[in-house]
Design a protein with these regions (language model features):
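Short, acidic loop-to-helix structural element flanking the phosphoryl-transfer center
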Residues: 2-6, 10-11, 90-120, 126, ...
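N-terminal helical cap/lid subdomain that shapes the substrate entry/recognition surface
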Residues: 9-19, 23-103, 114
Length: 137
């Protein structure tokens, strides 16, 4: 991290945090889940989905899943998207909780010597992120 960026983060009054890959090292967990979720359509499709997901981090599953369904020739319906989203959530929750902290995050957030306000900004659905946060140690 450059000196300028370090100064900016250390002395800002408000710090906004993403979750996956910033607080918890959970990006790989979600890559595996997308690949597994669509594995019934074959390795060519599931590998394409994994690659797309990894190149488009931060994009909501609610945007990705309809696209991925279209790649499988599944009829994209609200009910179908919700079914895949629910399955995805079941696949990732515990693995995200169990994933390691990003190195340095806990020390930084624990020090808060400048009395900063910290705000979590994530594409993870509200109920899911709240459940994950409640179960973190």
């Amino acid at each position: 991290m450059s000196e300028y960026l370090r100064h900016l983060v250390n002395y800002s009054k408000v710090v906004f945090w993403d979750f996956d890959g910033v607080i918890k090292d959970s990006v790989e967990v979600k890559s595996i889940a997308f690949e597994k979720l669509f594995s019934i359509y074959g390795s060519k499709i599931s590998s394409r989905i994994r690659e797309h997901h990894e190149k488009n981090g931060g994009v909501s599953r609610f945007d990705k899943i309809p696209l991925y369904m279209s790649w499988t020739n599944e009829l994209v319906t609200n009910e179908g998207v919700q079914k895949f989203c629910n399955q995805f959530s079941l696949l990732v929750k515990q693995s995200v909780i169990d994933s390691p902290w990003v190195p340095g995050f806990l020390e930084f957030i624990g020090s808060n010597h400048n009395k900063q306000k910290h705000i979590l900004v994530t594409a993870t659905p509200k109920d899911e992120i709240e459940e994950i946060l409640e179960k973190l140690d």
